[in-house]
Regions:
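Compositionally biased, low-complexity flexible segments
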Residues: 1-9
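N-terminal low-structure segments adjacent to metalloprotease catalytic domains
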Residues: 8-106
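Generic alpha-helical secondary structure signal
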Residues: 60, 64-67, 71, 136, ...
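Auxiliary, metal-adjacent structural segments of Zn-dependent hydrolase domains
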Residues: 69-168
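Short pre-active-site segment immediately N-terminal to the catalytic Zn-binding motif
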Residues: 171-188
């Protein structure tokens, strides 16, 4: 209590918070709305590093093995974790580095409020320019990440989420570590499928992230 003013400071803070909460949730600008996400996806795809050289046979083999491993990993993950999701095991999407960029940009856009409505706030006269600059910077970050990420479960992708496996990076890491390819690919899938099971068994998690 503020004895000099004869009032309770706690009440003042509560009243201030209550007043702020009356504002519409989308009335303030969000980070996501300051980025041109089309530019981010385009720049990111253009800047991706070349994939490790592989024969067409190896490329087809790793895609087939990752696809099969992503399905095989689901039952043991459900059994060990005790988490169960309704419906059949969904197929993973096996992608290269540029193909990973677009869904990653969409996911980042959703998580940063880029899908929120503008709420009527006045647009800055240079918003289009700054949005493209921010988009180019974001695209550069995505291109950097695209050369190292092995897989990702995106709970905001599509209607039911999507599991992405970046096969050039899987090849690069298994060569670097000199591990058995089949075992390493299964390990990657076990890790990423665990995230998928976490989200599909608890739908509120995706809603919380968005």
């Amino acid at each position: 209590r503020d004895r000099r003013a004869g009032r309770d400071l706690t009440d003042v803070r509560v009243r201030g918070m209550t007043k702020l909460s009356e504002n519409p949730p989308n009335s303030a600008p969000t980070l996501g709305r300051s980025v041109d996400w089309d530019v981010a996806a385009s720049v990111g795809a253009r800047l991706t590093r070349p994939a490790p050289p592989v024969t067409e046979y190896t490329r087809a083999q790793v895609i087939d093995e990752l696809s099969a491993a992503s399905r095989a990993a689901e039952p043991p993950v459900r059994e060990v974790t005790g988490l169960h999701a309704e419906g059949p095991v969904p197929d993973a999407r096996i992608v290269d580095r540029p193909q990973w960029i677009a869904p990653a940009a969409l996911s980042m856009r959703a998580m940063t409020g880029g899908d929120a409505e503008a709420g009527g706030e006045p647009q800055h006269p240079f918003a289009a320019v700054t949005g493209k600059v921010a988009g180019a910077q974001t695209g550069a970050v995505l291109s950097f990440v695209s050369s190292g990420i092995l897989g990702q479960y995106d709970p905001l992708g599509g209607d039911d989420g999507i599991l992405l496996l970046v096969y050039p990076n899987v090849i690069a890491v298994e060569r670097q570590l000199r591990v058995t390819p089949r075992d390493f690919r299964l390990w990657v899938c076990l890790h990423e499928v665990t995230h998928r099971v976490q989200f599909t068994a608890n739908p509120w998690l995706a809603q919380h992230m968005s």
